[in-house]
């Protein structure tokens, strides 16, 4: 049977026409679509297993993969094998954007293994495919038979000269003062992530509303296509838990969990006591139903077997725990650690605690602790970025590490996880907005945040610690940046916004909203919503409460260090920049890099040369910098008659004289008659040997009429005569 091809397009304004097509490609997947903007095209497919999940599975195994094919832009992949390999950071971050927006929209209890693959099959290298991938993934699910709540769309919002733009291209983003990716349904926003140049909370809301208008239209387009495809939904019904199980569990644990919730405890102590309650309740429940339910009853009503399933009992206890904590916050405005809704945990800051780092800070907020260091380098240390829309070098980076011991666990140590990449990217974007321009501070900057303890908001601790480490290292950032994670508990029209959330509040709550910024505005944000129907007035309230929390944290940071240190750290490289003629670059580099390597080995300085003749010298010692600079200046020096040089004897001719290299790659002749002012020289080798270092004066420069080469006449006798007459010799130049 030939599939019906459906292709529909929508004009979002400003020349942004997006089309969605289904029925042509990847027809054996449960759902597939191709989304196009300009000449950028993404293919999204979704397949959900029909195999019944294991009875003890308690999570939704959703896998989202986003891949950019180099062939999409007519490029070859780098590397020896010339094919795509593991996903890049850009691909991982794009996959996370899609995953975070889609995951809450699958029905509760749907635990079938599901895989979404988004592939960029064409790239015009102008329109980024990441938000198109979110739209395509949702559309692929909508045309499938997989259970799904609502169509979801993603857009990017930029702003140029005060005017908002939907899905700005890479050229427009250069001039935009914000870059926000927004994911949402017709009724609500479910995901935010972006960076901004210190915009206000009101401007942020305006940008979200502008993006939501486009999202509604894209969702309507998906619904139109889904209605035409008209694929019947596969049967799915979540397991019905017997009421006698929920009643028994609630009766056994509700009071105990409430008492525990109202007792402020350390994370470790709370976890131990909670685990003990779980173990006791599970054991008591299983024993109760073993005695109460006969095998015949289970055979007659298989749902009664759930009463003996420890995993199901665990889920029911967790539901009671969640309800207890949420009502404690909503009814009594109390939190697990005894704080008020808006209270930020105690903050402590130590600076300069890593002696050899170029800047360091230990930032502790409650039971979350980040050890952050900075390293300053040269352009050689920049990270090479090669993707479909960006081939520039990256000179400002933040790497976030989350070892298992930070939460008191053992675990895998190896390649960086997706969560670590995502958290590091958010913190990097927050601080990048206040980094000094390259013209003023030409260093490559690497920030490393190692999370030593975690009980919520570790990415925001990385923002605060990263800012402090930069200031400790003398990096002239424009303004300090702080970050705070906000939470939400919502039941009907009743809600509470929480500042500086704990891990449990994140897990049991409805929102995780991270906001970073300066005193003057927001620089980065990330929001994930677990519920439908987030009203804009709640979002406005959360942003304002986050602003107050952000300022409180900035006060604490500025108490520790009011401004960046004036000097760089002792072991940080000092950069000196000079401009040389373009035709002199080869002279400095030397044959096969011989000369520049020699300078590096002798002085300890690292030297970078740009194509325009900009030479950057990096060295941690002043002496090394001066030595390298002097050597380069000597290399570039032009021979001047009357100048005295310290040269090296390269060749000796007994009856003629000695050839001396008085400048790099420049030899002159000291005639036998010019060797001594006090005696007659009969044999040159009696006075000079190859390798000797001698002072010579350039006395004449002329061109050989026969060969056209420039000849340099040098004199040792003139140096002796000048010294005897007391002539100044300030112009001495040494050939290194």
Swiss-Prot record:
It comes from Chlorobium limicola (strain DSM 245 / NBRC 103803 / 6330). It is found in: Cytoplasm. It is an enzyme of class 2 (transferase). GO terms for molecular function: 3'-5'-RNA exonuclease activity; magnesium ion binding; polyribonucleotide nucleotidyltransferase activity; RNA binding. Mg(2+) binds at residues 506, 512. This is Polyribonucleotide nucleotidyltransferase. It catalyses: RNA(n+1) + phosphate = RNA(n) + a ribonucleoside 5'-diphosphate. Its main location: cytoplasm. Residues 573-632 form the KH domain. Coiled coil: none annotated. Pfam families: KH_1, PNPase, RNase_PH, RNase_PH_C, S1.
């Amino acid at each position: 049977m030939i599939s019906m091809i459906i292709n529909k397009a929508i004009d979002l304004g400003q020349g942004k026409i997006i089309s969605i097509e289904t029925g042509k490609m990847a027809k054996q997947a449960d759902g597939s679509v191709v989304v196009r903007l300009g000449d950028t095209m993404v293919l999204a497919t979704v397949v959900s297993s029909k195999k019944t999940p294991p009875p003890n599975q308690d999570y939704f195994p959703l896998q989202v993969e986003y891949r950019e094919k180099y062939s999409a832009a007519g490029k070859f992949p780098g590397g020896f094998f010339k094919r795509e390999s593991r996903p890049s950071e850009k691909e991982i971050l794009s996959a996370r954007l899609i995953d975070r927006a889609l995951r809450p929209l699958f029905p509760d209890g749907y635990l079938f293994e599901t895989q979404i693959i988004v592939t960029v099959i064409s790239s015009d290298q102008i329109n980024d495919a990441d938000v198109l991938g979110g739209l395509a993934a949702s559309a692929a699910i909508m045309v499938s038979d997989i259970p799904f709540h609502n169509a979801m769309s993603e857009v990017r919002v930029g702003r140029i000269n005060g005017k908002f733009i939907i899905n700005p291209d890479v050229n427009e983003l250069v001039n935009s003062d914000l870059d926000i990716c927004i994911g949402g349904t017709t009724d609500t926003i479910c995901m935010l992530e972006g960076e901004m140049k210190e915009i206000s909370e009101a401007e942020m809301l305006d940008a979200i509303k502008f993006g939501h208008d486009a999202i509604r239209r894209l969702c309507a387009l998906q619904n139109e296509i889904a209605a035409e495809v008209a694929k019947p939904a596969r049967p799915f019904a979540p397991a019905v838990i017997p009421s006698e199980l929920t009643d028994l569990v609630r009766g056994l644990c509700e009071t105990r969990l409430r008492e525990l919730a109202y007792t402020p405890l350390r994370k470790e102590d709370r976890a131990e006591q909670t685990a003990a309650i779980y173990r006791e309740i599970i054991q008591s429940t299983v024993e109760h139903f073993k005695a109460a339910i006969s095998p015949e009853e289970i055979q007659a009503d298989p749902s009664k077997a759930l009463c003996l399933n420890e995993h199901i009992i665990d889920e029911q206890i967790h539901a009671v725990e969640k309800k207890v904590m949420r009502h404690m916050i909503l009814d009594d405005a109390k939190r697990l650690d005894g704080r008020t809704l808006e209270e930020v945990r105690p903050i402590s800051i130590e600076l300069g605690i890593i002696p050899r780092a170029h800047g360091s800070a230990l930032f502790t907020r409650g039971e979350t602790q980040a050890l952050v260091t900075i390293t300053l380098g040269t352009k050689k240390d920049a990270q090479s970025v090669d993707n479909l829309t960006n081939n520039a070098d990256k000179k400002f980076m933040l790497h976030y590490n989350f070892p298992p011991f930070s939460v008191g666990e053992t675990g895998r140590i190896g390649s960086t996880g997706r969560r670590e990449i995502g958290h590091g990217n958010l913190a990097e974007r927050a601080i990048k907005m206040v980094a000094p321009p390259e013209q003023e501070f030409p260093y490559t900057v690497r920030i490393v945040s190692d999370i030593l303890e975690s009980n919520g908001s570790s990415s925001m601790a990385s923002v605060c610690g990263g800012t402090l480490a930069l200031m400790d290292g003398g990096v002239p950032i424009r303004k300090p940046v702080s970050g705070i994670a906000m939470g939400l508990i919502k039941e009907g029209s009743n809600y509470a916004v929480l500042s500086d959330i704990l891990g449990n509040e994140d897990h049991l709550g409805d929102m995780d909203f991270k906001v970073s910024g300066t005193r003057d505005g927001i620089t980065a944000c990330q929001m994930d919503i677990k519920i439908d129907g987030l009203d804009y007035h709640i979002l406005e309230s959360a942003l304002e409460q986050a602003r107050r929390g952000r300022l409180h944290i900035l006060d604490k940071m500025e108490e520790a260090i009011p401004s960046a240190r004036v000097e760089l750290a002792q072991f940080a490289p000092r950069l000196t920049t000079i401009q040389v003629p373009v035709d002199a670059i080869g002279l400095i580099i030397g044959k096969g890099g011989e000369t520049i390597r020699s300078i590096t080995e002798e002085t300890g300085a690292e030297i970078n040369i740009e194509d325009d003749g900009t030479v950057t010298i990096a060295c941690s010692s002043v002496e090394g910098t001066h030595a390298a600079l002097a050597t380069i200046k000597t290399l570039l020096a032009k021979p001047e008659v009357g100048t005295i040089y310290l040269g090296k004897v390269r060749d000796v001719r007994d009856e003629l004289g000695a050839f001396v290299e008085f400048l790099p790659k420049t030899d002159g002749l000291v005639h036998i008659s010019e060797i001594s002012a006090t005696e007659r020289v009969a044999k040159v080798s009696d006075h000079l040997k190859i390798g000797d270092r001698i002072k010579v004066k350039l006395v004449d420069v002329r061109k050989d009429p026969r060969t056209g080469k420039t000849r340099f006449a040098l004199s040792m006798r003139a140096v002796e005569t000048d010294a005897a007459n007391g002539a100044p010799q300030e112009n001495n130049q040494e050939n290194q």
